[in-house]
């Protein structure tokens, strides 16, 4: 089993989850490159195909420019050789600078995002994933603004087999998360995963609320580490990224969970996320099941979408 539990099961799930993307626009990219000679027409067509795959104009131009440089540096002649270089360039574009920091006592993951993106189910799936990694996980029902939020999370917590700390509707989210971190610390839990209100905030309110939550985490346990993961819906692609830019800055997000990747043929938005938001994709959702959230690896992603053509 590889890094973060990325073994055969996860590889198979990624393969199945990316089926629409692989046979859609990315299939067109492979067809564009396979059997082609490398010239300006090829670069133009490749740029167009990358944009159609939802990579975004800026990233498409950047990738094609870098590919052109690589082709010239290495004296490459065929589209197959170019596709292998493109594969490596895409993986480089998405590679995180560092792994997630789960070193704290406890580690805390704050999950943020607007309603409808799959935030609550992502929390349950994260809980299931880390439980399978041998960690003791506790959930915090920090979305106290929506009556159904904690009930929904409670159902998922039962499915994942993890405890949930909740309070009544309208309770202070920072207080709920404080209590959860306190409880987790006292009971020797490794990880707290906290839900937050899934509504569109104005920037000032969002910053104030999340800043208060961050302080409450450290107050409850000075040894805690904190990651803030923003959930985005892959089906809305570039639109989701545009809406998320200010949200990310205000929330001081550290990574992305990209859900519903199995429901789109345009999975290229994965490539755009890091460039446009400056944040790495940490997990991808590839199905409805509780074990259908898998850790994202750039290498695994390109392996499925752009299989290596040229044997070096």
Language-model features: where?
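Switch/coupling subdomain of P-loop NTPase systems
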Residues: 2, 9-13
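Primarily NTPase-proximal linker/entry elements flanking Walker-type ATP/GTP-binding cores
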Residues: 15-16, 20-144, 149-185, 189-194
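Conserved catalytic-core segment of NTP-binding enzymes
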Residues: 152, 172-187, 201-310
């Amino acid at each position: 089993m590889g890094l973060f539990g990325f073994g055969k099961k996860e590889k198979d799930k990624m393969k199945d989850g990316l089926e629409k993307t692989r046979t859609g626009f990315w299939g067109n990219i492979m067809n564009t490159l396979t059997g082609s000679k490398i010239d300006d027409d090829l670069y133009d067509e490749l740029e167009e195909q990358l944009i159609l795959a939802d990579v975004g104009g800026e990233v498409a131009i950047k990738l094609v420019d870098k590919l052109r440089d690589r082709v010239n540096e290495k004296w490459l002649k065929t589209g197959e050789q170019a596709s292998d270089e493109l594969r490596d360039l895409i993986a480089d574009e998405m590679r995180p600078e560092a792994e997630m920091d789960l070193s704290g006592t406890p580690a805390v993951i704050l999950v943020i995002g607007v309603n409808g993106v799959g935030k609550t189910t992502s929390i349950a799936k994260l809980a299931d994933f880390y439980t399978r990694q041998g960690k003791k996980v506790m959930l915090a029902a920090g979305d106290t603004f929506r009556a159904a939020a904690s009930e929904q999370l409670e159902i998922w917590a039962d499915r994942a087999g993890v405890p949930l700390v909740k309070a009544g509707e309208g309770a202070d989210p920072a207080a709920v998360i404080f209590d959860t971190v306190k409880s987790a610390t006292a009971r020797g839990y490794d990880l707290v995963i906290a839900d937050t209100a899934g509504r569109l905030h104005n920037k000032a309110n969002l910053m104030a609320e999340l800043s208060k939550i961050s302080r409450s985490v450290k107050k409850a346990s000075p040894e805690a580490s904190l990651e803030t993961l923003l959930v985005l819906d892959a089906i809305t692609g570039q639109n989701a990224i545009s809406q998320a830019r200010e949200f990310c800055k205000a929330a001081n997000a550290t990574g992305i969970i990209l859900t519903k990747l199995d429901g789109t043929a345009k999975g290229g938005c994965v490539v755009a996320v890091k460039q446009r938001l400056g944040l790495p994709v940490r997990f991808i959702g590839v199905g409805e099941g509780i074990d259908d959230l898998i850790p994202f690896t750039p290498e695994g992603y390109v392996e499925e979408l752009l299989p290596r053509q040229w044997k070096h």
